[in-house]
From Swiss-Prot:
Compartments in which it is found: Cytoplasm, Cytoskeleton; Cell projection, Cilium, Flagellum
Primary location group: cytoplasm
Protein name: Coiled-coil domain-containing protein 181
The gene coding this protein: CCDC181
Region of interest (Disordered), residue spans: 60-121, 285-367
Record text on subunit structure and interactions: Homodimer. Interacts with HOOK1. Interacts with HOOK2. Interacts with HOOK3.
Similarity annotation: Belongs to the CCDC181 family.
Gene source species: Macaca fascicularis (Crab-eating macaque)
Amino acid sequence: MNEIKDTDSKKSEEYEDDFEKDLEWLINENEKSDASIIEMACEKEENINQDLKENETVIEHTKQHSDPDKSLQDDVSPRRNDIISVPGIQPLDPISDSDSENSFQESKLESQKDLEEEEDEEVRRYIMEKIVQANKLLQNQEPVNDKRERKLKFKDKLADLEVPPLEDTNTSKNYFENERNMFGKLSQLCISNDFGQENVLLSLTNASCEENKDRTILVERDGKFELLNLQDIASQGFLPPINNANSTENDPQHLLLRSSNSSVSGTKKEDSAAKIHAVTHSSTGEPLVYIPQPPLNRKTCPSSAANSDRSKGKGKYNHRTQSARISPVTSTYCLSPRQKELQKQLEQKREKLKREEEQRKIEEEKEKKRENDIVFKAWLQKKREQVLEMRRIQRAKEIEDMNSRQENRDPQQAFRLWLKKKHEEQMKERKTEELRKQEECLFFLKGTEGRERAFKQWLRRKRIEKIAEQQAVRERTRQLRLEAKHSKQLQHHLYMSEAKPFRFTDHYN
């Protein structure tokens, strides 16, 4: 334990005062100490197991060789008295044997428990010492330098850009203007009692009718009334041309207004327009019976369709953006036949353009593929030509080398080589013939003299073969040296043939 403490103190002095390094050092030291403690515990357990095995063998031996004398028991008991106390054994009493076994097992368990408790106490004590040392080291450390550059940096603000909410001023102005125009106009309303018709009658004089054409009109949508500018409706193309054939006979006194569920804010110009029908009065001023006329286009928008301007009729005003009040669905229930035809034509044009674009992309891909194939084929042909050219050049070089060797070779030397090869071939043939004859004669040789003679001949033949091989190797090396020397001489002559009399060469730089 003292040695471990000394090593820990030395290592702590060697480290710098960096907090992160000290933490890593403490963690590593704790791991090492834990590993050493575990090894010590394992060694102790092994020693205990060995002692227990020895005790068991001794007890079995005493059971097998039990004597009335107690000399053996006296010898065994002092040796193992520190761990197990073996009781006296009677050879013919099975009950005493079982009692002794039980007592032995109990003593074994108690000894194991004591050892485990001692080991746990040692481990706890060692860990507490290490914790105290670590706390002392942390207390003795200098405070952390705040000016040191940190690895992790955080921003003061998470959001770099904050966008303020939009205020829809135009909608609020229109709302207040509609509220002012609605004041005092509800007394002039006359709603028809016919079921299934959503019509509103306005009983106005001629002057008021002309004024309303310049100003506003009351429109009903799903049981809600709104004041809208007549010029805006006419400019958007929602009002059909009014038939003024009977205007000289009967002046229009009442206007029957019918509107669809579409918004008049200008976002959807393909919605159905409000239908205005002139209803005549009698000359006496008494109103006639008002029969509501059905619209020309019977495919009206149902009441369940999405209405984007329902919030206008309510007293509460929601400050929301314009995109939130626009319904994403474009309904075709309230479109006129002409508008439907135009829509179909637009869809056909879009489909046609889309098909043309797809066809153009397919053609471009085919063209690119064709160009790539052409380029690849050209590159492959070029590579083949290069390979063939390289082979042709290599073959020409080999032929030139062979010709140069044949030209530069001495005829006398070639004759000598040929003669030598012939001589070697003849020698080989003679040797093979002699060997064959010797093999035939071995059958007739008898006694030690014949065997010794054959062995000597075999040794002589082996020596001759070895000498011939050495001579052949020497001749081959000499020939290679001569060829190398000749090639160097040729290179030197070629280099010297290039005359460079007017060139200055500085040999010192």
